Every structure is written in structure tokens, then in C-alpha cells.
Amino acid sequence: MKELNIALLGLGTVGSGVVKIIEENRQQIKDTINKDIVIKHILVRDKSKKRPLNISQYHLTEDINDILNDNSIDIVVEVMGGIEPTVDWLRTALKNKKHVITANKDLLAVHLKLLEDLAEENGVALKFEASVAGGIPIVNAINNGLNANNISKFMGIFNGTSNFILSKMTHEQTTFKDALEEAQRLGFAEADPTDDVEGVDAARKVVITSYLSFNQVIKLNDVKLVGISDITLADINAASALNYKIKLIGKGTYENGYVNASVEPTLIHKNHQLAAVENEYNAIYVIGDAVGDTMFYGKGAGSLATGSAVVSDLLNVALFFESNLHTLPPHFELKTEETKEMMDGAEPVVIQEKSNYYIVISNNNKSLEKVEYDIKKKLPFHKSLQLVERDQDTYAIIVTGIETSPEKVLNQSGFNIKKVYPVEGV
């Protein structure tokens, strides 16, 4: 039986999961790909470190050149993390005709197009299923399952830590601070939780998903970013009274050749599927022109969940190992001649979409009825308006079916706006 030699970069949480899955499912893997996977090298930072796995049969090295210069290595699996010098290692591996599998969202959010071009130039695969949503096979779904669709929008819960915190606040009336501390105790949140609670982790995944969905390269700075640290129980309870839940939603839309991307607290109607996604689970909702609405759900992190996605990529590469296939590009180019003309023109055509908003305003000692009356007079045409008392000083409002953000109009009319979040699933 042919052997498939792989090198593993990293033996932390995900790397250990990869080794465990390969060891425990070795016969099933052999039956699937008709090849035996051999882990020839494992790159670690400290060979003397004690590890939960028995790794005595593996060659551990602290020298990346042991891997890059080994011509027998077929696939490099990178689960070490970091951008530098990791990107240089992966570039060298691709140039040396080695397939690359990575779970590194930080790196891909910056260098995905560069690495994909290198893979194509060298006739090898670049796979990154684990980089977006752990065990959820969203990359394969978009690249292959939905490749007959023009995708116009995706939105989802991309970060399990923030979703766990919001679930605790919603169902147990826990404060943000206490929910975060529990997430840290359970290992869902890092000692420094900034990337999770301020939306940076989700934004990196939105950058990757935008490239997959729309075949457009955007940067992290292109993503509108608002975290959940300002969400209070007053917001949670006001949303509930209005029949909504608050989730940290990553979203991308594609119109006339342009991508709009965001990560921000969003009110999701309780009847929408995303509202039912709780605790550390992730879900991604994708809208295609042919298939309509689809949703992908599962655990977005963890040793075995993420390791499963890595090994899945490994098997997919192995199945096509003797062919000329390499990583599939995102679904066909969305820039038709018509949209190219729009993009090349001085004034791009903009499709006006109706939007929905959650707004918190000071009550200014006015009754709920008086505030509702005043807002209806000042706002441009809208579909519906709901108001509740948020706390003794503020009212919470949901306005739907409006063409422009109500923030400017209400500010000019003397309303003191405290917060504005989008609303979905109406």
C-alpha cells in the first residue's frame, strides 16, 4: 500500500487532535484513501515538553528545515499558528511542490490569495477547512456544494466564546463580566479575551468567507467591527421583550462588485434559525441564488472538532493525490460584463436595500407613547416600529423596513442616541 508522508507543524490542542484522529481511525482512513498516512516529522517549539499523547514513535524536531528539505514529504499540515515566520514556511513548502493544509485563520486573513496563487502555480493543494468554523465544513460547502450558485449574502455566529457569553446573559441573567469569567474557567476564553469579545477572531473568519463566497479579496480593516463588551442585561432583556436575541454576527453581502462586511452585535428574531444557536456552537447562514437559504451548524473550536476538519482536508488531498487537481477556486467569478461596467464607471450603481435597526435612546422624561409619536413623525418611511422601556433612563426601539440609518435623522431631531445595532431575521 502506498504511503502518504506528512509533516505536522505544531502539537498543541489542534495538533494533538489531528494525531489522535489519525491513530484511532487509521484503518478507516486506509480503506477510504487506499493509502497509509505516515506522520514523518512533527515540528515543535520544545522537544522536552511533557505532552498528553504518547509520541515516542514520532520524530519531533525544532528545525523547520528538517521538513522543508525532506523531498519525501507529500503534505505539510500547519496547526502551529502565527503569521511570521509561518507564512514563509508555507510559501517554501508550496514552492517545493508540497501540498499544504492549514487551520491558521490569522495568517489566511492576510495571505490567503498569495498562498492560493502559489498553490496554483505549483500544481499543489492549499486546504483550510479548519480555519473558518472548526468542525463545520463551510469551506467545502461553499467551494463545492454551492459552486453552482451566486452567493449574495452570508451571516453567522463565527465565535463560540462570544456566543457562550451572550447565551449565559440571555438564559441565566449573568452579567457580561461573570459570563466571561465562566468562559475562561471552562477554557472557552483565553486569559486575554480581546480577540473573541471584540470581534477580531470573527472578523478574520469573515475575511476568509468573503473571499470564498464572493471571489473578492478584502482586508481585516475593511470589516466594520463592534464587539460585545458594551452589551448589558438591559439590552438582552429589551431584545427579549421585543421577541429577539442578541448575537455577535459576522456578515458579508455582495452588490454590484462590492463587498460589505461586518462583525457586530445583531438582534436576531427568535423565529430565525440563528437564534437557536447557543453556547459555544457556531452556525453560518448562506444565501445562494439557486439553492436559497442554507445553514451550517456545529462546534467551531476544540481539539477533535478542529482536528476533524484538518484530517478531512488531508483525506481530500489524498483522494486526488495522483491527479492534477489542486485546491478548487471559489465558485465562478461573479463579475459579469454588466457588473464590470458598473465597477469601471465613475458612479457605481447601488441597489437600495431595506434595513432594520435596534436603537437605544434616552427617554428625556417623556412617556413611551410620546416618544413613539415623535419618532414616527421624524423617521422616513418605515415598515414597523416597536418600543419598550429598556431601563429607567432609556427606551429600546426596533424599526424595520427603512432605507437609511435612522441615526442621523433622530440626532438632528434632538433624540439622544446611545446605541444602534442591526436587526436580522425579521
What would you call each of these model-derived segments?
Residues 1-95:
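N-terminal glycine-/serine-/threonine-rich beta1-alpha1-beta2 phosphate-ribose binding loop
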Residues 86-92, 105-132, 139-142:
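Rossmann-fold NAD(P)-binding glycine/threonine-rich loop
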Residues 120-201, 208:
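Rossmann-like NAD(P)H-binding beta-loop-alpha module
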Residues 180-276, 281-283, 302:
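Substrate-binding/catalytic subdomain of NAD(P)-dependent oxidoreductase enzymes
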